[in-house]
């Protein structure tokens, strides 16, 4: 279980995340939503121990995040990080070996994932030759090739058409069914509703809405949730 307790992070005078509490259990998906600058990426960076919170504690299975625990996390960053001149095989095996996987085992998993994501026959293609959608699929495989227990997915559907978005959603649901704890951010609100068990909405680093997705839908109906804004801050999340 991932647990964030009263997490606060400041950059100078700006409060990026303000007393955030959140729990993500194995076999559960948390949707983290909010406009750009709401604190989602900062939250991900603190979970990954890239930056430290100024206040509060983050634990996985009751233990503070360590290097060993980080090996159990799969992270899909919003800014994709593929090496353009490598083939798909070279790329994925490189990431797998960073996590201590044996080459043969990793290649077997790669072939299986390429079949699931419908990019069979491209294993020797260089990343730079791939369409945006196929490159996104390869990035997804890189995120989970080491069989992580916990996934952080930052805008996983960016660049995907509806068919491939649905394909990726199916695999995320399968990972959840196999016990993975998953937290993801997305501006695709229909995807948030379809995938999430729990929902957290941030505005300027503070939680403005949190709870079971069906409880939220029962409370507000299948409509639009408006968050009070100022002139420089327009924020609208639709759950429909």
Predicted segment positions?
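Conserved ABC transporter NBD signature motif
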Residues: 56-69
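Conserved ABC ATPase signature
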Residues: 126-130
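Catalytic Walker B motif of ABC-type/P-loop ATPase nucleotide-binding domains
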Residues: 151-155
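ABC transporter nucleotide-binding domain
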Residues: 169-240
């Amino acid at each position: 279980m991932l647990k964030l307790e009263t997490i606060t992070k400041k950059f100078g005078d700006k409060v990026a995340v303000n007393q955030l509490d959140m729990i993500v259990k194995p076999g559960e998906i948390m949707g983290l939503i909010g406009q750009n600058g709401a604190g989602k990426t900062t939250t991900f960076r603190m979970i990954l121990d890239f930056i430290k919170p100024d206040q509060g504690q983050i634990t996985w299975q009751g233990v503070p995040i360590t290097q060993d625990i980080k090996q159990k996390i799969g992270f899909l960053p919003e800014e994709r990080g593929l090496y353009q001149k490598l083939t798909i095989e070279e790329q994925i095996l490189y990431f797998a070996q960073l996590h201590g996987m044996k080459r043969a085992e990793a290649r077997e998993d790669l072939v299986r994932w390429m079949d699931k994501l419908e990019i069979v026959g491209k294993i020797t293609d260089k990343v730079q030759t791939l369409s945006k959608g196929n490159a996104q699929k390869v990035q997804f495989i890189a995120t989970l090739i080491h069989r992580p227990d916990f996934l952080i997915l930052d805008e996983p559907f960016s660049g995907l058409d509806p068919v491939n978005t649905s394909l990726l959603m199916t695999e995320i649901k399968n990972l959840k069914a196999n016990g993975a704890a998953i937290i993801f951010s997305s501006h695709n609100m229909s995807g948030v509703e379809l995938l999430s068990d729990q929902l957290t909405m941030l505005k300027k680093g503070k939680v403005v809405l949190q709870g079971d997705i069906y409880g939220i839908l029962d409370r507000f109906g299948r409509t639009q949730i408006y968050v009070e804004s100022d002139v420089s801050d327009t924020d609208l999340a639709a759950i429909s």
